[in-house]
């Protein structure tokens, strides 16, 4: 007997970019980790060493690795795509079980060639189309193309600054393509709003950082960059637990 839509378990993906965050996310009950570096830049490709350690420490937790060479737009040239595909190959060997990627053309449509290259390189692992869809010119066509080229999921805030603002488009994505692709509602998701997001979007996956500020140790007066003046952010064990507790009875 198959599950009905209302009976499906609602799951939580936590994005992390450091080992402390990974430990807290797993201890809090995260169903999956989106593994990145530099979340303050929207998430970039993680190192092979980082993924290797996570795979060793948490063999039962799915690890979906961000593939994004640089910050900025999602229009990649040939050399950048070669580097992206090389990263996929090495991260597969390190223990990645899935990938997160998105590429657009300069006109704002899904770059089929680049996306197909990543999907083929990632096989047999699934690939999620990330929030590039939120800056696509036409999200409906972009989502149809994502399904057509073989993405298994899409991460979105509904083309708004937060998932809470984008609930109507997220709900429409879910209704239009139910059963064809998993829609992950993400950006600004927390324990105080996730119940409303479940009610309004009907998604079965939610994506959050569940992070809190952590003051950096003042080792010296020499700055390594602008981010030195900002507190780092670490996934909160309690916030992950509260998210899971809120999702469990829904």
UniProtKB/Swiss-Prot annotation:
Gene3D superfamilies: Copper homeostasis (CutC) domain. GO terms for cellular component: cell junction; cytoplasm; cytosol; nucleus; striated muscle dense body. It comes from the Eukaryota. Keywords: Copper. Disruption phenotype: Reduced copper tolerance, which results in reduced brood size and retarded body length, protruding vulva (pvl) phenotype. One of its GO terms (molecular function) is copper ion binding. GO terms for biological process: copper ion homeostasis; egg-laying behavior; IRE1-mediated unfolded protein response; multicellular organism growth; multicellular organismal reproductive process; response to copper ion; vulval development. Involved in copper homeostasis. Affects body morphology and length, egg laying and brood size. PANTHER family: COPPER HOMEOSTASIS PROTEIN CUTC (PTHR12598), COPPER HOMEOSTASIS PROTEIN CUTC HOMOLOG (PTHR12598:SF0). Belongs to the CutC family. This is Copper homeostasis protein cutC homolog. It comes from Caenorhabditis elegans. The lineage of its organism: Eukaryota, Metazoa, Ecdysozoa, Nematoda, Chromadorea. The gene is cutc-1.
């Amino acid at each position: 007997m198959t599950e009905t839509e209302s009976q499906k378990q609602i799951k939580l993906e936590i994005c992390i970019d450091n080992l402390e965050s990974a430990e807290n996310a797993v201890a809090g009950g995260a169903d999956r980790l989106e593994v990145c570096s530099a979340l303050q830049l929207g998430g970039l490709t993680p190192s092979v060493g980082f993924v290797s350690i996570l795979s060793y420490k948490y063999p039962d937790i799915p690890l979906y690795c961000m593939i994004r060479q640089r910050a900025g737009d999602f229009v990649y040239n040939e050399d950048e795509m070669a580097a992206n595909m090389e990263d996929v190959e090495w991260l597969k060997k390190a223990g990645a079980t899935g990938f997160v990627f998105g590429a657009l053309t300069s006109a704002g449509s899904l770059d089929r060639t680049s996306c197909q290259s990543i999907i083929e390189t990632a096989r047999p692992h699934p690939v999620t189309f990330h929030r590039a869809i939120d800056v696509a010119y036409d999200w409906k066509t972009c989502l149809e193309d994502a399904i057509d080229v073989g993405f298994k999921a899409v991460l979105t805030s509904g083309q708004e600054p937060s998932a809470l603002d984008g609930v109507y488009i997220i709900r429409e994505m879910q209704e239009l393509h139910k059963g064809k692709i998993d829609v992950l509602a993400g950006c600004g998701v927390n324990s105080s709003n996730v119940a409303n997001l479940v009610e309004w979007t009907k998604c079965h996956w939610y994506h959050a950082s569940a992070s809190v500020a952590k003051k950096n140790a003042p080792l010296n007066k020499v700055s390594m960059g602008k981010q030195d003046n900002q507190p780092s952010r670490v996934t909160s064990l309690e916030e992950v637990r509260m998210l899971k507790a809120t999702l469990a009875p829904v």
